[in-house]
Amino acid sequence: MRHFLTLKDFTKEEILEMIELARSIKAQTKRREFVPYMENKTLAMIFEKSSTRTRVSFEVGIYQLGGIGLFLSKNDIQLGRGEPMKDTARVVSRICDMVMIRTYEQSKLEEFAAFSQVPVINGLTNEYHPVQLMADYLTMIEYGKADSPVVAYVGDGNNMTHSWLMLASKLGFTLRIATPKGYEPDPNIVEDAMRFAKESGATIELMHDPKAAVQDADVVTTDTWISMGQEEEKEKRIKDFKGFQVDTILMSLAKKDAIFLHCLPAYRGYEVSEEVFEAHAEEIFDEAENRLHAQKGIMVWLDRKRGES
């Protein structure tokens, strides 16, 4: 049985299998053909962190696959009142067929998976956001930006940065990360990525100059400067991230046909300018929709692997 906790747990071939499955299911969906790959199966969706895209895409996704989505906030279950994660895992996994968790610490997610009898999907943690990267890569394919691309990430060294590190190092493309000093990605995750990069031929570059990162890039991406739980740091972060906004001047350094991606929600005037966001709105909202399709591919792939075990 396999879980989907972080992309470092998968080979290049497995990641591409899930992507191809997502593309196939998306094509069926666009033809209004809803194949019940997960008929009568239940996806438990546990949310310790609130979300728009994660809840909507998983709930609609499992429904379109013929299953049922069960939304559980931390206030709906005993987890929010101190029940150990391992006990919640034992109960939920005996009743449901798959579990998606959106939480804070990666260690919580991994503890749940260790005691679960069914596949567990990472809907987001402080350390990683792998389902978003699957949607991003699906979008890159659709825009013709998946053949040895140069991807530039500008901003905070957060869970999105960590997930880009995993994707690039597994698939073998070039990733440039520009962060302010003091906001670099986790060195342990960087170390993992560098090790994977040696095997895949990926090029990983960390720097503090956004202009150097974006130069001739095929894909430019960023994320919020102030993640959930960092609200008290807002003023300091705005000051520290000066010069790291993806605006028209910075974007002009990328290739003329470069695309811009953002996992949303976007805070215009901070990490991205209004002009850049609206100029690339089609890509951004295709990316948001692709959460639905990428996650369906992941769920079906995991369900099949469970059936094989």
From Swiss-Prot:
GO biological process: arginine biosynthetic process via ornithine; citrulline biosynthetic process; L-arginine biosynthetic process
Keywords: Amino-acid biosynthesis, Arginine biosynthesis, Cytoplasm, Transferase
Transferase in keyword set: yes
Chief location: cytoplasm
Binding of L-ornithine, residues: N159, D223, S227, M228
Gene Ontology CC annotations of this record: cytoplasm
Pathway: Amino-acid biosynthesis; L-arginine biosynthesis; L-arginine from L-ornithine and carbamoyl phosphate: step 1/3
Pfam families linked: OTCace, OTCace_N
Residue numbers binding carbamoyl phosphate: S51, T52, R53, T54, Q78, R102, H129, P130, V131, Q132, C263, L264, R291
Compartments it resides in: Cytoplasm
Entry-linked InterPro entries: Asp/Orn_carbamoyltranf_P-bd, Asp/Orn_carbamoylTrfase, Asp/Orn_carbamoylTrfase_sf, Asp_carbamoyltransf_Asp/Orn-bd, Orn/put_carbamltrans, OTCase_ArgI
Group of enzyme by EC: transferase
Domain of life, source organism: Bacteria
Keyword Amino-acid biosynthesis assigned: yes
EC number of the protein: 2.1.3.3
Family listed: Belongs to the aspartate/ornithine carbamoyltransferase superfamily. OTCase family.
NCBIfam families xrefs: orni_carb_tr, PRK00779.1
Its job: Reversibly catalyzes the transfer of the carbamoyl group from carbamoyl phosphate (CP) to the N(epsilon) atom of ornithine (ORN) to produce L-citrulline.
Cited HAMAP family: OTCase
Protein name as annotated: Ornithine carbamoyltransferase
Origin species: Nitratiruptor sp. (strain SB155-2)
